[in-house]
């Protein structure tokens, strides 16, 4: 596809290309990263299937982890050999049409080996099994391929089709497995003391928490159960008291001398210490007096002066904790136990027993606290067995197991892969957090892990280390579709494994084969439950292409294993610095899900571990390189990263010496040589939807959020129109959405019609036949949200297309660009108060021209069942229905395509058998006299609902296999056969044309007898392909080549016929319908929605409103030349909302249209072509000043330039990228070029009076969207409808054909006005007085205006409620009064 980038001599814009935009982008985009917007879905699923080379995941690895399964008695083993994933039976469109799941059959090859128990001969096969060196011989071995069900397959658009409905699996943001350190921020205790905790979160298994209490004792919890001292856990791991002390504390050796205890001088231990004694060297010289605080500088100076040991007075060891037991050398009695503090009496004993050296624990209460020691001394005499039993009692209270069971249970908690899994991510996080070097594949906890977590935890109160930020994206990862399905797959496989083992323990192995052990429904049921009912498996938002893309890129913190909206606090919802370039800070819902559901930033991608990466360009010595690197949030904090808007010179070097950079979550000013990276684009922080808002930087964030969300609600219009003022992202979103048809490879368009595009693959460097691509377009299909999906070809025969060129537009697409709305002429002013409170005034001309008209497709289904009284039937002669109502049905009883239907129309005539009824004698006489037919069935036809009116555009009839088909279904089947035949003939035509040309070339080069013709070409001119084959094969010089060509030709023709036959076979196979269903008829009705008061409209800047009035075009304000404005917006809606972007868009749109008008005037000037071309070239060069397009315009031929200029008549398309929009001066320059007032304001005239308004008005072109909140879908009035079973009051809501609630406050209003009779009617006969309802109906029929009100049913319900509370409530009539009362 030619584009602005394809500059060069003779630049030509293809007809199917969008007009290049005048772009104000100042940075260079990396478009490669935007080529696949739904890669997050596709890559994840491919990894699960195992498509990626070197992938550790995949279905194969799941089966390998489950098998082999051994018989509990060791008699047999079931082994996994291989897995085979088949091809889908039906394509995506056929699955939607049939209402089935798009899936592939999955089969595994299993080997069942049965061992012999008796002695074996040497000739038999030997197997060495796990039990030592024991050899067993095989009794018999059977290998078999077994079906294990169907696997739902992802479509090419990143969706799943489940029961005919497209669904999306939303990715989930959850806390990454690993260890996290946190504090209560002083909120737990009134003292404000920080309480620190640590938590080890696995991917699967029990959570392990460590926490301090107010007394600085360390406890642990398993799965948030009752807490125990952490030393119980350490002892359960096999550590003794001495092991615990040795692990958590350093030892300091005190050596006895004549003057005191000699201690090694370590600088770090004296930092901030206040001496309680004189600091002396070993010779007794006082270096520092007591009560002096030693700073780190003083300590370093002492060490530099040669101090290596110092003296501690004999009494100075009081209060220190001994590291090992101090034992009397003579008696062996323990003087001081390990961990105990030295007391005054101990010092005397130490002198008596002449102990020469003592090892003390390095606890100084300043940098090292006695937390573990204090915890140990809570109960230091507890044994390993006691600790194990205590842990067991906490988790399994009420049970009394033996020691082996307790050990096994404890081991299974954290140390067995079957019950505990950190995952590779969790192991990596643990290793990096704790500075460990443990193999990534070891995904269970180790003793070292637990010890190091406690070690790091005890450093926090001492001021070392920092707590983790749980909202940091280094601590949150994304679980995508592949991971969810893999987890469900494992659940299903575990159930299957248990079933196989149960079956093995009871079955006779003599005749068993692998298929006996496998029930394919188990896995299929688990997967079906997930896709049908999981919170993250969602009905795809298919309102427009943008809503599809956004839904697939959505990130949710909700769902299984995630947060709940009720408990999620402000912190987790808030924007975090690490979201930069990873998660959009703008796009999120406005309701209670705000911040919990977000969208992936436009350039972000997810690595194999589930962490979000953002791209940056590498900077070396102040020069920006083209190298792009993706960084994690944890890596990013170490670098200085400049903003994409930083000024660069022609050598890509920073112009400024100092730049603002992001570093560690803050903005700092650094030298340009210190900068490590630069953003790839200013728009990398926003999502796809936000990147489509021009002048986003000029809008308030709240309005930008609304603008992003409302673009997803825009309904595709009858004629799509790309925005004049865009952002340059429109084509990217269109191509990435799947709404357009992209060319699979280079080729030439061979044939085009409304339903097919046929392209012959073509490569200038290859001569051989490369094949044909046939694209079947989606015509008037219904989307999930009832909008119309219709693809239109934009190429013509003979066009050369390249790979990924747009060859057909879809819904809301205009020449490959996203087109959600329309460019309309807007005036910001008030008009008779009709634009009060954001209301919108629309010109009737807009409605007349179908500018905002949209087509919606409604689907109605009629099910024909087999009843106990006989089958229901589709027929035209429906009892008690007049012929006029059946006029649009065919002979079968199904509505004709093209029929105009309205509320109450019969779509499908159907009757249901009913039990025979005995007729009264008078009825029998009438039947006999008049010969009337007595129907033994009742009308159960499909009628059009009250609020629908439209045209029938399609009918599908599905007849159960084995049931006779009706004429209509045969007709539909024949049309499908014709469609398949058409595809086959297209392919054969392309093949025949190619080989005809090639054979002709070959024959022309051969020496053929002319037989009277002037030359070879005239000889071959009228010959058919068959005749040319005969000529070529009869010529001995070229017969070998011709035979080779004929072989290839025949092979391709046979292949085309084979594909056709396969499609016919599938069609003739019939339909598998649910039990008891004979036929299903689906009728599709196209409904045309014109713009009308009550419809909701919006711009892209959060400027939404409801249409208040459609004004006749002659009454609308108009420009000086008589052009009426299309839409009037309230100017008071701008200042308070602070979305100034709409005003700037209006000005730029005004300039764009008037530039186009000026080009049009030049084209229509009537001058000679030469001067016109040069004036246009000169003018466009001025318009595109400073753009690459200026060179393209200069290189165009005259013909190409005129063609290009004609495409600009309606306006010059502009691109104002996010954060790079044009400045005021640039907009003013364009307005001047367009010959309009640079202020963007013009004189307007009142259409009713013709008078000019007092002040100039801001007028321009703005892009407006029609949202799917249509008044036709909301407005509703009840006449007669259903009543509630208990209260007998009318139901509520349009879907239940309900009434308007007359509530408590409305009753007050009637009471205030004293309207007693009206109030009585409202509360009785118009609501739930059953008897009164009947009586008033009878009165109306008789023409009598009198009626009586009875007792409301709600009163009876209240009486029943009171009686259920054992209160006997009786109504009595008082003789003196006419009113009733309750006693």
UniProtKB/Swiss-Prot annotation:
UniProt xrefs under InterPro entries? DNA-dir_RNA_pol_bsu_ext_1_sf, DNA-dir_RNA_pol_bsu_external_1, DNA-dir_RNA_pol_su2, DNA-dir_RNAP_su2_dom, DNA-dir_RNAP_su2_hyb_sf, RNA_pol_bsu_bac, RNA_pol_bsu_CS, RNA_pol_bsu_protrusion
Stored PROSITE patterns? RNA_POL_BETA
Q: Has keyword S-adenosyl-L-methionine?
A: no
Pfam families (UniProt xref): RNA_pol_Rpb2_1, RNA_pol_Rpb2_2, RNA_pol_Rpb2_3, RNA_pol_Rpb2_45, RNA_pol_Rpb2_6, RNA_pol_Rpb2_7
Q: EC number(s) for this protein?
A: 2.7.7.6
User: Which positions are tagged coiled coil?
Assistant: none
CDD domains associated with the record? RNA_pol_B_RPB2
Q: Which GO terms describe its cellular component?
A: DNA-directed RNA polymerase complex
Catalytic activity entry: RNA(n) + a ribonucleoside 5'-triphosphate = RNA(n+1) + diphosphate
Q: Which UniProt keywords apply?
A: DNA-directed RNA polymerase, Nucleotidyltransferase, Transcription, Transferase
Record GO terms (molecular function): DNA binding; DNA-directed RNA polymerase activity; ribonucleoside binding
Q: Gene3D superfamilies attached here?
A: 2.40.50.100, 2.40.50.150, 3.90.1100.10, DNA-directed RNA polymerase, beta subunit, external 1 domain (2.30.150.10), DNA-directed RNA polymerase, subunit 2, domain 6 (2.40.270.10), RNA polymerase alpha subunit dimerisation domain (3.90.1800.10), RNA polymerase Rpb2, domain 2 (3.90.1110.10)
GO biological process terms, semicolon-separated:
DNA-templated transcription
Question: Which PANTHER family does the entry mention?
Answer: DNA-DIRECTED RNA POLYMERASE I SUBUNIT 2 (PTHR20856)
Q: Which NCBIfam families match?
A: PRK00405.1, rpoB
Function, as annotated: DNA-dependent RNA polymerase catalyzes the transcription of DNA into RNA using the four ribonucleoside triphosphates as substrates.
How does it associate, per the subunit comment? Answer: The RNAP catalytic core consists of 2 alpha, 1 beta, 1 beta' and 1 omega subunit. When a sigma factor is associated with the core the holoenzyme is formed, which can initiate transcription.
- UniProt similarity note: Belongs to the RNA polymerase beta chain family.
* UniProt name for this protein: DNA-directed RNA polymerase subunit beta
UniProt source species = Anaplasma phagocytophilum (strain HZ)
Q: Which gene encodes it?
A: rpoB
């Amino acid at each position: 596809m030619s584009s602005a980038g394809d500059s060069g001599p003779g630049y030509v814009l293809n007809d199917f290309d969008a007009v290049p935009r005048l772009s104000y982008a100042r940075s260079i985009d990396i478009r490669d990263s935007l080529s696949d917007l739904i890669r997050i879905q596709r890559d994840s699923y491919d990894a699960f299937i195992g498509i990626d080379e070197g992938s550790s995941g995949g279905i194969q690895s799941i089966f390998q982890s489950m098998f082999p399964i051994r018989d509990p008695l060791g008699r047999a083993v079931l082994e996994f050999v291989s897995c085979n994933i088949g091809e889908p039976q039906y394509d995506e469109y056929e699955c939607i049409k049939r209402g089935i799941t798009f899936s592939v059959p999955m089969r595994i090859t299993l080997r069942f080996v049965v061992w012999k128990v008796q002695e074996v001969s040497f000739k038999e096969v030997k197997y060495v099994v796990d039990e030592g060196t024991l050899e067993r011989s095989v009794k018999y071995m059977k290998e078999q391929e077994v079906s294990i069900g169907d696997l739902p397959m992802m479509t090419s658009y990143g969706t799943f089709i489940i029961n005919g409905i497209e669904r999306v699996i939303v990715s989930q943001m959850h806390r990454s497995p690993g260890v996290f350190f946190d504090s209560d921020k002083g909120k737990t205790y009134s003292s404000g003391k920080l309480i620190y905790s640590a938590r080890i979160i696995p991917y699967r298994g029990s959570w392990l928490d460590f926490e301090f209490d107010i007394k600085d004792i360390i406890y642990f919890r398993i799965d948030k159960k009752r807490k125990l001292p952490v030393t119980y856990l350490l002892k359960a791991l096999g550590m003794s008291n001495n092991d615990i002390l040795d692990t958590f504390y350093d030892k300091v050796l005190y050596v006895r001398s004549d003057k005191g205890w000699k201690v090694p001088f370590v600088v770090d231990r004296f930092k901030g210490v206040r001496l309680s004694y004189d600091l002396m060297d070993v010779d007794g010289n006082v270096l520092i007096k007591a009560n002096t605080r030693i700073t780190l500088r003083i300590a370093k100076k002492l060490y530099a002066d040669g101090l290596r040991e110092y003296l501690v007075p004999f009494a100075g060891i009081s209060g220190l904790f001994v590291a090992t037991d101090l034992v009397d050398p003579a008696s062996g009695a323990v003087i001081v136990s390990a961990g105990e503090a030295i007391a005054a009496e101990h010092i005397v004993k130490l002198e008596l027993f002449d102990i020469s050296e003592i090892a003390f624990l390095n606890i100084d209460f300043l940098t090292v606290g006695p937390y573990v020691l204090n915890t140990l001394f809570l109960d230091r005499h507890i044994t390993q067995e006691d600790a194990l039993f205590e842990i067991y009692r906490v988790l399994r209270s009420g049970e009394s197991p033996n020691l082996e069971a307790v050990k096994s249970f404890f081991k299974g908690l954290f140390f067995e892969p079957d019950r505990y899994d950190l995952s590779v991510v969790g192991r990596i996080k643990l290793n990096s957090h704790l500075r460990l070097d443990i193999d990534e594949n070891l995904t269970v906890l180790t003793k070292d892990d637990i010890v190091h977590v406690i070690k790091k935890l005890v450093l926090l109160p001492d001021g070392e280390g920092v707590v983790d930020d749980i909202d940091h994206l280094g601590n949150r990862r994304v679980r995508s579709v592949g991971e969810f399905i893999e987890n469900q797959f494992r659940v299903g496989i575990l159930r299957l494994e248990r079933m196989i083992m149960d079956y093995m323990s009871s079955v006779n192995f003599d005749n068993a084969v692998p298929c006996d052990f496998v029930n394919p429904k188990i896995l299929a049921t688990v997967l079906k439950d997930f896709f049908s009912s999981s919170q993250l498996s969602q009905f795809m938002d298919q309102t427009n292409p943008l809503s599809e893309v956004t839904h697939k890129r959505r990130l949710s913190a909700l769902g299984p294993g995630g947060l709940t909206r009720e408990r999620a606090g402000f912190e987790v919802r808030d924007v975090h610095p690490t979201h930069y370039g990873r998660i959009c800070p703008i796009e999120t819902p406005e309701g209670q899900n705000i911040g919990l559901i977000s969208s992936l930033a436009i350039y972000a991608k997810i690595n194999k571990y589930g962490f979000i990466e953002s791209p940056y360009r590498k900077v070396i010595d102040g020069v920006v390189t083209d190298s792009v690197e993706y960084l994690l949030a944890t890596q990013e904090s170490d670098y200085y990263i400049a903003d994409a808007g930083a000024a660069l010179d022609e050598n890509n070097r920073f112009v400024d010496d100092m730049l603002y950079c992001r570093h560690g979550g803050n903005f700092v000013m650094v030298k340009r040589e210190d900068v490590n990276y630069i953003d790839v684009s200013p728009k990398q922080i926003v999502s796809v939807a936000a990147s489509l808002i021009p002048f986003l930087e000029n809008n308030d964030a709240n309005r930008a959020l609304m603008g992003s969300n409302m673009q997803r609600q825009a309904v595709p219009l009858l004629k799509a129109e790309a925005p004049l003022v865009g952002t340059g992202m429109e084509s990217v979103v269109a191509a990435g959405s799947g709404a357009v048809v992209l060319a699979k490879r280079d080729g030439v368009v061979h044939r085009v019609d409304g339903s097919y595009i046929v392209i012959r693959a073509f490569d200038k460097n290859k001569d051989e036949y490369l094949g044909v691509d046939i694209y079947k377009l989606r015509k008037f299909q219904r989307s999930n949200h009832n909008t119309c999906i219709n693809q239109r070809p934009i190429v013509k025969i003979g066009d050369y297309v390249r790979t990924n060129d747009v060859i057909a537009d879809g819904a809301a697409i205009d020449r490959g660009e996203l087109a959600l709305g329309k460019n309309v002429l807007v005036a910001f002013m008030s008009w008779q108060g009709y634009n009060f409170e954001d209301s919108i005034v629309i010109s009737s001309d807009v409605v007349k021209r179908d500018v905002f008209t949209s087509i919606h497709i409604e689907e109605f289904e009629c099910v024909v069942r087999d009843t106990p009284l006989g089958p229901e039937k589709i027929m035209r002669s429906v009892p008690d229905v007049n012929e006029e109502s059946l006029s649009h049905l065919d002979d079968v009883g199904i509505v004709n395509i093209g029929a105009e239907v309205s509320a109450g129309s019969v779509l499908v005539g159907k009757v249901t058998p009913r039990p025979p009824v005995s007729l009264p004698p008078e009825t029998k006489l009438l039947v006999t006299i008049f010969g009337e037919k007595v129907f033994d069935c009742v009308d159960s036809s499909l009628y059009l609902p009250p609020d629908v009116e439209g045209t029938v555009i399609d009918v599908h009839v599905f007849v159960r296999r084995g049931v006779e088909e009706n004429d209509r279904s045969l007709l539909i089947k024949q049309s499908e056969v014709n469609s398949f035949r058409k595809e086959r003939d297209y392919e054969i035509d392309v093949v025949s044309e190619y080989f005809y040309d090639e054979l002709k070339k070959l024959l022309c080069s051969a020496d053929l007898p002319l037989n009277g013709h002037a030359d070879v070409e005239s000889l071959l001119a009228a010959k058919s392909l068959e005749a040319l084959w005969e000529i070529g094969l009869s010529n001995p010089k070229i017969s070998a080549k011709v035979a080779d060509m004929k072989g290839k030709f025949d092979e391709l023709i046979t292949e085309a016929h084979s594909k056709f036959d396969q499609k016919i076979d599938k069609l003739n196979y019939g339909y598998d319908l649910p039990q008891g269903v004979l036929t299903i008829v689906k009728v599709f009705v196209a409904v045309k929605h014109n713009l009308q008061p009550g419809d909701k409209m919006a711009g892209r800047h959060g400027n939404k409103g409801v249409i208040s009035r459609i004004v006749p075009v002659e009454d609308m304000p108009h420009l000086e030349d008589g052009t009426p404005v299309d839409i009037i917006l309230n100017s008071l809606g701008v200042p308070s909302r602070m979305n100034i972007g709409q005003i700037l868009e209006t000005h730029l749109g005004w300039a764009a249209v008037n530039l186009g008008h000026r080009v049009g005037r030049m084209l229509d000037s009537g001058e000679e072509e030469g001067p016109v071309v040069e004036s246009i070239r000169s003018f466009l060069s001025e318009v595109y000043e400073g753009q690459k397009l200026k060179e393209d315009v200069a290189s165009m031929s005259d013909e190409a330039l005129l063609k290009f200029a004609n495409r600009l008549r309606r306006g010059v398309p502009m691109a104002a990228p996010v954060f790079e929009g044009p400045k005021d001066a640039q907009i003013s320059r364009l307005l001047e070029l367009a010959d309009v007032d640079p202020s963007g304001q013009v004189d307007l005239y009142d259409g009713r009076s013709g008078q000019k308004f007092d002040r100039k008005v801001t007028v321009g072109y703005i892009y407006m969207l029609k949202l799917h909140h249509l008044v036709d879908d909301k407005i509703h009035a009840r006449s007669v409808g259903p009543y509630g079973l208990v209260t007998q009051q009318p139901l509520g809501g349009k879907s239940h054909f309900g009434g308007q609630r007359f509530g408590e406050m409305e009753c007050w209003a009637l009471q205030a006005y004293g309207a007693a009779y009206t109030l009585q009617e409202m509360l009785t006969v118009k609501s739930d007085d059953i008897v009164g309802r009947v009586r008033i109906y009878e009165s109306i029929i008789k023409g009598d205006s009198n009626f009586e009100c009875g007792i409301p049913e709600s009163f009876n319900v209240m009486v029943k409620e009171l009686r259920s509370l054992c209160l006997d409530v009786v109504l009595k009539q008082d003789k003196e009064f006419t009113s009733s009362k309750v006693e």
